[in-house]
A protein has these predicted regions:
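Non-heme Fe(II)/2-oxoglutarate
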Residues: 1-75, 82
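Residues at beta-strand starts and edge strands
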Residues: 2, 8, 109-111, 161-163
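Catalytic core of Fe(II)/2-oxoglutarate
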Residues: 119-182
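Small/flexible residues
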Residues: 39, 47, 114, 145, ...
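Catalytic core of non-heme Fe(II) oxygenases with the double-stranded beta-helix
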Residues: 65-145
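General structural signal for secondary-structure boundaries
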Residues: 11-15, 94, 118, 170-174
Length: 182
């Protein structure tokens, strides 16, 4: 569904530094994930990292965002690459926590945050529900509403890698979700 209504809001700035970590990533060694739609994109499951960056993600998700369950993906979109129009299916997080939820309930359970890890540059874009997120800066935090309902897409037709952090989670525990939906 596309309504051309702004369904996102800038809600803050990531409270820890990312540049030193991102610069060290050897994207050629990063494997494709099981739920990745576009083969050229590279994704790191940040919540699984056993280092200071992973600990910062864990603290941010649990303390600052008050998420009881979550996934956090660092994705690199190379030049010349597009993310086709889609809605979120929440395959990884529902599988990870063994959640059985009807698609119609996803937006009542899950929250999505989109956080660019590099400033917007020529050729980079992200469109959500037909509305562009404009002049983003590295570490801006955008909350996206209804990501299983509203279509979104993005791309990189520029010269530099486009790198983002996406956090999907719930402020309900897995047990509470099981109680509600079983």
């Amino acid at each position: 569904m596309i309504t051309y209504t702004k369904m996102f809001e800038k809600v803050g700035t990531l409270p820890f530094e990312t540049q030193h970590y991102i610069e060290k990533i050897d994207w050629d060694t990063v494997q494709k994930t099981d739920t990745q739609r576009v083969s050229e994109h590279k994704t790191i499951r940040a919540e699984l990292l056993d280092d200071s960056f992973g600990r910062n993600i864990k603290y941010f998700c649990e303390q600052d965002l008050n998420l009881k369950l979550y996934q956090a993906n660092i994705s690199m979109i190379p030049p010349g690459s597009l993310t086709p129009m889609h809605t979120n299916k929440f395959e990884y997080i529902t599988k990870k926590y063994n959640l059985i939820i009807e698609k119609e309930q996803y937006d009542n359970v899950f929250i999505k945050y989109w956080i660019p890890l590099a400033d917007k540059t020529i050729g980079h874009w992200f469109e959500y529900n037909g509305v562009l997120i404009g002049d983003w800066k590295a570490m801006d935090i955008y909350r996206l509403w209804g990501s299983s309902t509203f279509e979104h897409c993005g791309g990189n037709l520029g010269l530099e890698k486009r790198i983002r952090l996406e956090i999907i989670g719930s402020q309900l525990s897995a047990n509470k979700i099981h109680q509600i939906f079983t």
